[in-house]
Amino acid sequence: MLLRSLVGSLTRQWSQFARCAASLSLPAVGAQRCLSTITAAAVPFRAVVNPMFKPHTAFLSPLLGRCQQLLCVQPSAGMKTKSALKKRCNECFFVRRRGRLFVFCKAHPRHKQRQG
């Protein structure tokens, strides 16, 4: 039962990687993230199949490259919650939705804010 779920998980990861590799519009960082999810999923699978397996960092490091540190720290795409909203640039604009005030920016999406 456990082996079947692990195999299913790996096939999903491979299909996801194939989709990432097929679309040329993704940047290189996106492709490296796909590789990192596959290698991260393959290590526990090998450890279950062969308990004496020890992952080789030499195998993982060329695949991950400089994005190895990005596995732990991923930027979130959420909104900042503030009590006093301000326009941070000329492109920012205010919107009132659901009784709250929001700031959106098409030029710099990191300027998104929500009144809290």
Curated annotation (Swiss-Prot):
Against PROSITE patterns, the record matches this protein to: RIBOSOMAL_L36
GO CC annotation terms, alphabetical: mitochondrial large ribosomal subunit
The record's subcellular locations are:
Mitochondrion
Q: Which Pfam families match?
A: Ribosomal_L36 (PF00444)
GO-annotated molecular function? structural constituent of ribosome
InterPro entries reported for this sequence: Mitoribosomal_bL36m, Ribosomal_bL36, Ribosomal_bL36_sp
Q: Does the keyword Aminoacyl-tRNA synthetase apply?
A: no
- Provide one Gene Ontology biological process annotation: translation
Which keywords does this chain's UniProt record carry? Mitochondrion, Ribonucleoprotein, Ribosomal protein, Transit peptide
Family membership: Belongs to the bacterial ribosomal protein bL36 family.
Listed under subunit, the entry gives: Component of the mitochondrial ribosome large subunit (39S) which comprises a 16S rRNA and about 50 distinct proteins.
> Can you name this protein?
Large ribosomal subunit protein bL36m
Q: Which organism is it from?
A: Danio rerio
Its organism's taxonomic lineage begins at: Eukaryota, Metazoa, Chordata, Craniata, Vertebrata
Q: Which gene encodes it?
A: mrpl36
